[in-house]
Amino acid sequence: MKNLLSISDLTPNEILSIMDEADRFAEALKGREVKKLPTLRGRTVFTMFYENSTRTRASFETAGKWMSADVINISASSSSVKKGESLRDTALTLKSIGADALVMRHPSSGAAQHVANFIGDTAVINAGDGSNQHPTQALLDATTLRRQRGDLSGQHVVIVGDILHSRVARSNAQLLNALGADVTFVAPPTLLPIGVENWGVRVSHDLDAELPSADAVMMLRVQAERMNGGFFPSHREYATRYGLSKARHAMLKPDAVVMHPGPMLRGMEINYSVADAPNTVVLQQVTAGVHVRMAILFQLLIGGHSASETETDA
């Protein structure tokens, strides 16, 4: 694996390899007072974020630093991008400085692929490109779900909300299908993309009908920043029809889990108390995100050996 641009680039075995590696890193860090491994000592990772981020950016930085890499953050608002520098020139500048990996988030779909086409031997990791792909989010979601419920084959995962603008929904649908899960999208017709029937998922507009059979429910934020028109009458009506209320939460099986990629809009797509319920695994997703991103950096920059084979005390 040279880059990580899309879930569709990975085979099921490669997906499972990353998830297994993430679990090995979690085990390697368990009980350590100082969370530091020498795995990527001497490697340099640049994060290039052209959109705001909390979880993805912080967990990539943590992942790199816990493996002793030098991690340098570049934000569009404080770089030469503000002076008109192109994405190509910025990426080539960082490569010339000595980047071993570029972690990219960009509002344009295909931006990470564009950089990968000319950057040579520097690894490119897509941390979200427009409404196209968010492969590391799908990998951490699957890792979290497997830790909670075991093998994903046959699990019914219901993904609810703004599917149209969601790179998370696209990446999760591809990954979950690859691992044999059954995926249902629930959304108003205005928030479903054209051609969604070809994604290998079921589509429903009735959340109440899907909840009783769900093994996991993933709530998505309405991405108002990507909307230019009225996709639903009001926030109140959206929450009434598609929000995970306390009453709807009670419809779930006892062992079902509630997920959210964040940031959550409490009171919109998820009830305040449901967001903090015992079976809501949002914080477990964040924790898994660090382990998964460690695994990805490791496989791209080292490869060929498992974390357990390369681990020594720092």
Swiss-Prot record:
Pfam families tied to this protein: OTCace (PF00185), OTCace_N (PF02729)
Reaction catalyzed: carbamoyl phosphate + L-aspartate = N-carbamoyl-L-aspartate + phosphate + H(+)
Keywords assigned: Pyrimidine biosynthesis, Transferase
Record field: transmembrane: none
InterPro entries assigned: Asp/Orn_carbamoyltranf_P-bd (IPR006132), Asp/Orn_carbamoylTrfase (IPR006130), Asp/Orn_carbamoylTrfase_sf (IPR036901), Asp_carbamoyltransf (IPR002082), Asp_carbamoyltransf_Asp/Orn-bd (IPR006131)
Family of the protein in this entry: Belongs to the aspartate/ornithine carbamoyltransferase superfamily. ATCase family.
GO biological process: 'de novo' pyrimidine nucleobase biosynthetic process; 'de novo' UMP biosynthetic process; amino acid metabolic process
Protein name, as recorded: Aspartate carbamoyltransferase catalytic subunit
EC number annotated for this UniProt entry: 2.1.3.2
Subunit architecture: Heterododecamer (2C3:3R2) of six catalytic PyrB chains organized as two trimers (C3), and six regulatory PyrI chains organized as three dimers (R2).
NCBIfam families: asp_carb_tr, PRK00856.1
Native source organism of the sequence: Corynebacterium urealyticum (strain ATCC 43042 / DSM 7109)
Annotated positions binding carbamoyl phosphate: 55-56, 105, 134, 137, 262-263
Top-level taxon in the UniProt lineage: Bacteria
Presence of the UniProt keyword RNA-binding in the record: no
Pathway(s): Pyrimidine metabolism; UMP biosynthesis via de novo pathway; (S)-dihydroorotate from bicarbonate: step 2/3
Binding site for L-aspartate: 83, 167, 221
GO CC annotations, alphabetized: cytosol
Residues annotated as signal peptide: none
Role noted for this protein: Catalyzes the condensation of carbamoyl phosphate and aspartate to form carbamoyl aspartate and inorganic phosphate, the committed step in the de novo pyrimidine nucleotide biosynthesis pathway.
Gene transcribed to yield this protein: pyrB
A GO MF label: amino acid binding
